[in-house]
């Protein structure tokens, strides 16, 4: 759900539209496989948290943003996945945030290894680094020896 901080700093049910102009977006918690489970938005009027993978996908995808995939598809009502990274876009020399760009990979549940993420990660990471990213605490051994 979406929750707003009230004047007593308590979280109450609310809507993203009440935060005003969004000044920052912070990933607070990630779940299994790296999907975002909790976001914090700070705005000119209020601060809110968005909880739950599907709520995050719906809120960010329904914001009027154009969602483009690597194949050029742009027909999504929600983000295809909560496996995302959010970066601010700055305008001008005074470093004012003009927008946020969302980078993502994969579709659906976010459990296991995302093929789209691995494709991009393989440009700069070894297979060992990629496996250890998706499967925490694993040890890679040669079992044939």
Model-flagged regions — what are they?
Residues 1-145:
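Conserved, single-site charged/polar hotspot
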């Amino acid at each position: 759900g979406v929750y707003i901080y009230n004047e007593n700093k308590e979280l109450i049910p609310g809507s993203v539209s009440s935060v005003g102009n969004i000044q920052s977006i912070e990933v607070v918690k990630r779940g299994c496989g790296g999907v975002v489970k909790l976001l914090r938005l700070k705005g000119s009027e209020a601060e809110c948290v968005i909880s739950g993978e599907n709520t995050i996908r719906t809120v960010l995808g329904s914001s009027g943003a154009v969602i483009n995939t690597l194949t050029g598809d742009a027909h999504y009502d929600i983000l295809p996945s909560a496996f995302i990274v959010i970066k601010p876009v700055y305008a001008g020399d005074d470093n004012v945030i003009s927008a946020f760009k969302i980078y993502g990979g994969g579709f659906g549940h976010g459990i296991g290894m995302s093929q789209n993420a691995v494709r991009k990660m393989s440009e700069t990471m070894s297979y060992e680094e990629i496996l250890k990213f998706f499967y925490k605490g694993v040890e890679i051994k040669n079992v044939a020896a």
